[in-house]
């Protein structure tokens, strides 16, 4: 969902009611978070699975993009850059989208930091999430074969005095124009092509998203360089234990 400044239309699949509130992170957490136990000469150390993945420079954006998601992802990006500004960060996306302002905070931080960011779509990258997918480093934007990508214009709702409604309408149009320009920047498509495809919900297969310029590659197994990054981090952690 790419929501406007206030609210927006819901997609066919909504957030499950059984989903628990987030715990210390903006990632929407289920009632059971897997824990990872690591053994070293100093004893055992327990991590929740997302914290362990962060050690591998992996960030997961699961579920709707909102302020909770945004402030955690921004903090993770800044932290990983401070750890090693030249080493890649890997962002996995499975999201229906969400609030534009929250998504743009993540987007701007992705562009702001010096670390290259690879993006990987699994499940879906719809609305605002599709922009984050496209915003990865060139040549490093990927999707798994059965994922779905969707782009559309922002939507919003506002009630109040007529002049205030007019003001908010102009703001939503301004945001729409800005988003169109960002898709032009990252896809290489002409503005009129982007605007026409953004006019309504436009669903794409990974191959169609590749042709449109949102991703660079459709993959069905983990790229070797991602495996090397993970192994390298693990070896470094063990040597420092």
Curated annotation (Swiss-Prot):
GO terms for biological process: proteolysis. InterPro entries: ClpP (IPR001907), ClpP/crotonase-like_dom_sf (IPR029045), ClpP/TepA (IPR023562), ClpP_His_AS (IPR033135), ClpP_Ser_AS (IPR018215). The active site is at residues 127, 152. Its main location: mitochondrion. One of its GO terms (cellular component) is plastid stroma. It is found in: Mitochondrion. One of its GO terms (molecular function) is serine-type endopeptidase activity. Gene3D superfamilies: 2-enoyl-CoA Hydratase, Chain A, domain 1 (3.90.226.10). Constitutively expressed in leaves, shoots, roots and flowers. Pfam families: CLP_protease (PF00574). Its EC number is 3.4.21.92. It catalyses: Hydrolysis of proteins to small peptides in the presence of ATP and magnesium. alpha-casein is the usual test substrate. In the absence of ATP, only oligopeptides shorter than five residues are hydrolyzed (such as succinyl-Leu-Tyr-|-NHMec, and Leu-Tyr-Leu-|-Tyr-Trp, in which cleavage of the -Tyr-|-Leu- and -Tyr-|-Trp bonds also occurs). Residues 1-30 form a transit peptide. The keyword Mitochondrion applies. It is an enzyme of class 3 (hydrolase). Keywords: Hydrolase, Mitochondrion, Protease, Serine protease, Transit peptide. Homotetradecamer. Component of the mitochondrial ATP-dependent Clp protease. Cleaves peptides in various proteins in a process that requires ATP hydrolysis. Has a chymotrypsin-like activity. Plays a major role in the degradation of misfolded proteins. Belongs to the peptidase S14 family. NCBIfam families: PRK00277.1 (NF001368), PRK12553.1 (NF009205). This is ATP-dependent Clp protease proteolytic subunit 2, mitochondrial. It comes from Arabidopsis thaliana. The gene is CLPP2.
